[in-house]
Amino acid sequence: MGKYFGTDGVRGVANRELTPELAFKIGRCGGYVLTKSAERPKVLIGRDTRISGHMLEGALVAGLLSIGAEVMRLGVISTPGVAYLTKALGAQAGIMISASHNPVQDNGIKFFGPDGFKLSDEQEQEIETLIDSPEDMLPRPIGSSLGQVNDYFEGGQKYLQYLKQTIDEDFSGMKIALDCAHGATSSLATYLFADLEADVITMGASPNGLNINEGVGSTHPEALAAFVKEKGADVGLAFDGDGDRLIAVDERGNIVDGDQIMYICAKYLKETGRLKQQTVVSTVMSNLGFYKALEAQGISSVQTAVGDRYVVEEMKKNGYNLGGEQSGHIIFLDYNTTGDGMLTALQLVNIMKIKGKPLSELAGEMKKYPQLLVNVRVTDKEKAMEHEQVKKVIAEVEAEMNGNGRVLVRPSGTEPLVRVMAEAPTEEACRTYVERIADVIRREMGVE
C-alpha cells in the first residue's frame, strides 16, 4: 500500500483527510497517468449517495478538466456500473467516488483503467509520486484545449440492460426482497428486478445523503432477514453502499454469505460446463466448510490475500472465471471486471429459478464451521502485527488447534484495525481463541 492508495483506492474522512484539495490533485495527476497517450481523453465519474460525493466530484472534475480530459458524469451508480461502462463506452479511465461499506463520514476515490480493471500498484505509485511532487510540471492546456464536462445519467440503464443479458430466465412468480443500503443501487436494483417480472419489495432504498449503510445493507443483513420473514419473501438480497457486494437471505431468514453464494454458483457453472479449469478463487477468510463442499463436488480452490483486487489478479493471471470473498464480493470474470452485487444477485436467483429449489436447500449443501471475527482498534496496525507478544499468542493458539481449525490475524486495508478470526469445531472454542489473541493486542497496542 502507498501513502494515499490503500487496498481499494484512496479513502479517508471526507473534508478532513480526503479534502477537495487532495481530490483535485488526484483528478489532475490520476487523469494524466491514465490518459497521457490520448489526445482528447474521456473519463467517466460515478458516485454513491454520500453527502460528500458532490464536493469530491466537483474537485475531481476540475482536476481532470485542467489536463484536458473530457468528463462524463454518470451521477449515482454502482462501482461495477462504472467499471462496465468505462470499457463499454471506450473511455480511457473511470472513477468511482465511494467508501463502499464504510460510515457516511468516510469517502473514497478509486480508478479503473480502459479495460475496466482497477489500477496496478505501479500505476498507483506513479500517481502518488506526481501528487507529492514539489512542483506541478503537468500540462496546462488553455482555450479550446481545456476539457469539458457532460452528464450521461442514462449510463445506469445501459448497464442494467447489459446485466439482464447474462441470465436465461425472468423471475415471474418470485417475491424478492431487496436491501439497497440507502446506497448506489437504491433505484437501479428495484428497477432491474421489477423489469424481470419479480414481485419486488424494498428496504434501505431511501438515501438522504447521510443514511448510507446505517443499520442496513450487506454489513447488517439481520435487518433484511427480519424483513424477509415478515413479508414472506422467497429470497432477500442485500447490497452494500456502492453495490459491489451481495449477501443473501433465504426464505427462512437465514443469512447466506459470500462463501455459500460462491459454492452455489461454482456447482452450477460446473454442471453446465462453464467453470473454467474447475477452479474457484477465494481469500484466506473463506470458511473451511467452503473448501470441503467444493472438494466434494470435484472443484479445486485457490487462495489469495484478503481484497477483491487480489482475487481478480489471480483470476486474470491463471484464466479462472469465478472468485470472490466471504464478505460478498463475487467476481464473474466472463461478465464484469470487479465484484458486482446486482450481477451476483441475478446469477443466484437465476439458479434458484432453473433448479426450482429454495435458497435454504441450495445453501444447506455447504456446512459452515463456526467462525468468529473480532476487530481490535489499534494505534498502529503494522506495529501490532510485528509485536512479539502478539506473535507469541498466535503461535500458542495454532499449536493448540493442532490442525482442527485455524486462526487468521491481519490488519485492515482501510481502517486502523487488526482483524482476529478463528474457526474451530465449536463456537465456544472460537470465542476462547479469538478473545485470547484480541486481549493481547488490546493490552499491547490498543486505543484507550
UniProtKB/Swiss-Prot annotation:
Keywords associated with the record: Isomerase, Magnesium, Metal-binding, Phosphoprotein
Gene from which the chain derives: glmM
Free-text remark on how the cofactor is bound: Binds 1 Mg(2+) ion per subunit.
UniProt EC number: 5.4.2.10
Gene Ontology cellular-component terms listed: cytosol
Phylogenetic classification of the source organism: Bacteria, Bacillati, Bacillota, Bacilli, Bacillales
Single annotated GO MF: phosphomannomutase activity
Name this polypeptide is given: Phosphoglucosamine mutase
Residues binding Mg(2+): S100, D240, D242, D244
Residue(s) carrying Phosphoserine: S100
Enzyme class: isomerase
Keyword Phosphoprotein: yes
InterPro entries noted in UniProt: A-D-PHexomutase_a/b/a-I, A-D-PHexomutase_a/b/a-I/II/III, A-D-PHexomutase_a/b/a-II, A-D-PHexomutase_a/b/a-III, A-D-PHexomutase_C, A-D-PHexomutase_C_sf, A-D-PHexomutase_CS, Alpha-D-phosphohexomutase_SF
Pfam family, one: PGM_PMM_I
Active-site residues annotated for this sequence: S100
Co-factor(s): Mg(2+)
